[in-house]
């Protein structure tokens, strides 16, 4: 026993380093038609052209807060994988209870 806990790597035992794509401006992946479909589902008939960027900004800030809370739950449990329950608890903490995923 080396006392490193579970999943620790010893010296010289590191895995191969992979090149990771730099993530930037991925919010543009939420396309105009996707936003339009969400609005249609919500009962919206006509959409102003300025709505799309505003929607992306609001969605980004919402997801940042939910993910921050979910990662906090994950780190507290000493895990490296965010589970669906972490997200459910993060949403519940923000007053947006989600049913159907346990918890």
UniProtKB/Swiss-Prot annotation:
UniProt-listed SUPFAM superfamilies: Histone-fold
Source organism of the structure: Talaromyces funiculosus (Fruitlet core rot fungus)
One function term, GO molecular function aspect: protein heterodimerization activity
UniProt DNA-binding region: 17-21
Chain spans, region Disordered: 1-20
Keywords, comma-separated and alphabetical: Acetylation, Chromosome, DNA-binding, Methylation, Nucleosome core, Nucleus
Pfam families given in the database record: CENP-T_C (PF15511)
PTM sites of type N6-methyllysine: 6, 9, 13
Domain of life: Eukaryota
Alphabetical list of PANTHER family matching this protein: HISTONE H4 (PTHR10484)
Protein name from the UniProt record: Histone H4.2
Function: Core component of nucleosome. Nucleosomes wrap and compact DNA into chromatin, limiting DNA accessibility to the cellular machineries which require DNA as a template. Histones thereby play a central role in transcription regulation, DNA repair, DNA replication and chromosomal stability. DNA accessibility is regulated via a complex set of post-translational modifications of histones, also called histone code, and nucleosome remodeling.
Biased composition (Gly residues): 1-14
Modification(s) after translation: Glutarylation at Lys-92 (H4K91glu) destabilizes nucleosomes by promoting dissociation of the H2A-H2B dimers from nucleosomes.
Coiled-coil region: none
Family of the protein in this entry: Belongs to the histone H4 family.
């Amino acid at each position: 026993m080396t006392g490193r806990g579970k999943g620790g790597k010893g010296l010289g035992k590191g895995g191969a380093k992979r090149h990771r794509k730099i993530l930037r401006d991925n919010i543009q992946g939420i396309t105009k038609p996707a936003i339009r479909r969400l609005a249609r589902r919500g009962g919206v008939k006509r959409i102003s052209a300025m709505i799309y960027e505003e929607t992306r900004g609001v969605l980004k800030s919402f997801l940042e807060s939910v993910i921050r809370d979910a990662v906090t739950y994950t780190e507290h449990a000493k895990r490296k994988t965010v589970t669906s329950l972490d997200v459910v608890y993060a949403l519940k903490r923000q007053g947006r209870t989600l049913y159907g995923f346990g918890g």
